[in-house]
């Protein structure tokens, strides 16, 4: 077990010596984004900043899984969390779409539903309102309290095969088990997948949503690399581990979350595979999704992009323009630290989550403020750090009367748009 230099919160971490999925000992380095604090470790202005941990991804030479080379103690990352699903209108609206799709597959029957990593219960609230019996599991004690206060029963714990057995004993097997943007966060993925199988009724359905590696690769989403995301999952890599536990994919949908995600549907029996599932597999194959060459090109392009992004921001500073950021997301932390941008460049970062206000961003040390307070600084330029919510955030800026330059870091090449 390694630790970093002393600070108020020293982050314990381990460097892996083998693949987390297949245990092969050859995991090749792909991209090194330097030493960075864990992305959601916001801190008070008068406190010492959080410690830094290497942020590197590699590729298993055997099973091709793309994964972080360091594992930060999950208790330090997830026991107290600052991301609330309900603060993003895109996610709230998508919850209704997600429920529609689920009910189409379950043919409208009332189901018992377990969600792993249920956050504030936004998705389960929609399903409960539609007549389903719901239960959430989430390790963040503070967010579990929010969920329970809103009427969503939630167990505050890390999901595992042992917890799954307890849930089944105290409740029942579930018709549907959902894991949305959870599987990339889990070091012992075998225990979680085994637990999902353990929780699932014989004719049940497991639904896995994850930021899709083909889009990460094609659109250069290197900012989705941070210490909470231990994997960059493809459909291929998800199927690889799910199949080991008898879970078989039969359909796939797309989701707007994280700038583009897959929603894959699995069952314990062989079901007819949808055309969209076959098309997704073919697309990943055409990209050589697991190849070392593809990810080495990704790393080269990411390195070039970081420099271009920094130059745009520094160029605006040289013209005496006042700059704020919008969206103190986890991915913004990777982006800012990789580009070595800080409070000397960006006056403040606006965020719609009140829990983050008055806190400092890790590494870049920029104050997070309310949207109104950020606009009161009279910015000439807004850096759209949470670019994956572009439509929502641009609409908010326009409605507030902002007129000026907006730097769009991703996807693709960083560029400026005028509004």
Model-identified regions with their sequence ranges:
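Conserved beta-strand signature within the Rossmann-like core of class I S-adenosyl-L-methionine
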Residues: 203-211, 405-409
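Extended interfacial segments that mediate partner engagement and assembly in macromolecular machines
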Residues: 50-146, 221, 226, 294-314, ...
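Class I SAM-dependent methyltransferase SAM/SAH-binding core
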Residues: 129-162, 348, 354-357
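Flexible, glycine-/basic-rich loop-and-beta segments that form/coincide
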Residues: 258-301
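Short, glycine-/aromatic-enriched active-site segment of Class I SAM-dependent methyltransferases
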Residues: 208-231, 235-238, 242
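A short glycine-rich, Lys/Arg-flanked "PGG" loop and its adjoining helix->strand segment in the class I
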Residues: 190-205
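A conserved beta-strand element that flanks and buttresses the S-adenosyl-L-methionine
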Residues: 178
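N-terminal juxtadomain amphipathic helix
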Residues: 2-90, 253, 263
